[in-house]
């Protein structure tokens, strides 16, 4: 009998955190955060990081594990996350993967191959120089001709991954996206119960806008000032996160605060749209509409599925 794993995904601001903690309490679970921003130390407000109070003594993994100046790949997440899963299982608890970063979720629940071994340092340096001279969008557009799926899935500001996708195509002649497809892709050692929270788009967008306002009220600007004092700059992977790069532009007097806030809201809404597109392509996902089901009904369904299957 395969070990069960619960996955709770969904777009930003849909309400994953509170529900996941209730589930962990009911199912004797521990949570592995699948969020590409919550991995960073000292970046709490802009990442909507779960607080100690919100955790309610539920163990959380993959939060505050790297400093903002460090590079961190999906392969890194997979290596550390797999160890966390084994630790949770050893305690006879249920591993629960919770978050909105689909690549992170797949790295732990799919038969994912990382093409990290072959490299072309000269070509990579060339692409880096192109991005420096012309901006991230320039190299991102280069993807469009050779790998539509990666072009759609990888954000222009994720320069490292864009460059890796271009590099893989140059080395192998195969699109980066083609390395993780096929009949065996969803085969794992685990019995994966995968749920995605959704709600009406306008309602979700309103929640996103409100959350951004609360982040500003709670001190996002001060958080970014402190990060700048520590020497962290907009060229770092971590500081390209939505909420951070816009406030850094404001602090550098490139845009007004109102412009920064509006850009954060727009960027967050666009991100939520991309997240939903990602989840809809995954045949394992069971979608739970929060406009149709109450939180209690969602809890009951998931608990019933896990305990009776």
Swiss-Prot record:
Named cofactor requirement(s): Mg(2+)
Signal sequence range: none
GO MF term (any one): ATP binding
Keywords from the named record: ATP-binding, Magnesium, Nucleotide-binding, Transferase, tRNA processing
Binding-site residues for substrate, renumbered to this chain: 12-17
Binding site for ATP: 10-17
Pfam families: IPPT
Catalytic activity, as annotated: adenosine(37) in tRNA + dimethylallyl diphosphate = N(6)-dimethylallyladenosine(37) in tRNA + diphosphate
Record function comment: Catalyzes the transfer of a dimethylallyl group onto the adenine at position 37 in tRNAs that read codons beginning with uridine, leading to the formation of N6-(dimethylallyl)adenosine (i(6)A).
Name this protein carries in UniProt: tRNA dimethylallyltransferase
Organism whose genome encodes this protein: Clostridium botulinum (strain Alaska E43 / Type E3)
Taxonomic classification: Bacteria, Bacillati, Bacillota, Clostridia, Eubacteriales
Encoding gene, per UniProt annotation: miaA
């Amino acid at each position: 009998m395969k070990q069960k794993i619960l996955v709770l995904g969904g777009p930003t601001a849909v309400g994953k955190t509170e529900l996941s903690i209730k589930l962990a309490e009911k199912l004797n679970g521990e949570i592995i955060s699948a969020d590409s921003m919550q991995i960073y130390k000292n970046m709490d407000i802009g990442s909507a990081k779960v607080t100690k109070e919100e955790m309610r003594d539920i163990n959380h993994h993959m939060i505050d594990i790297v400093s903002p100046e460090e590079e961190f790949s999906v392969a890194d997440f997979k290596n550390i996350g797999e160890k966390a899963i084994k630790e949770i299982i050893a305690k006879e608890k249920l591993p629960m993967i919770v978050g909105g970063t689909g690549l992170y979720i797949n790295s732990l629940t799919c038969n994912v191959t990382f093409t990290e071994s072959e490299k072309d340092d000269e070509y990579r340096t060339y692409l880096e120089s192109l991005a420096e001279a012309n901006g991230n969008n320039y190299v991102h557009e280069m993807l469009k001709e050779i790998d539509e799926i990666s072009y759609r899935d990888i954000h222009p500001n994720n320069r490292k991954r864009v460059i890796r996708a271009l590099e893989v195509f140059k080395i192998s002649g195969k699109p980066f996206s083609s390395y993780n497809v096929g009949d065996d892709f969803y085969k794992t050692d685990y019995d994966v119960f995968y749920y995605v929270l959704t709600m009406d788009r306008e309602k979700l967008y309103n929640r996103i806008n409100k959350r951004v306002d609360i982040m500003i009220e709670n001190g996002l600007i001060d958080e970014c000032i402190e990060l700048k004092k520590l020497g962290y700059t907009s060229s770092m992977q971590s500081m390209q996160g939505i909420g951070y790069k816009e406030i850094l532009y404001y602090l550098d007097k490139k845009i007004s605060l109102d412009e920064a806030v509006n850009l954060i809201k727009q960027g967050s809404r666009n991100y939520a749209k991309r997240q939903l597109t990602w989840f809809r392509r995954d045949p394992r996902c069971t979608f739970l509409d929060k406009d149709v089901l109450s939180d209690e009904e969602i809890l009951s369904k998931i608990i019933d599925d896990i305990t009776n299957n």
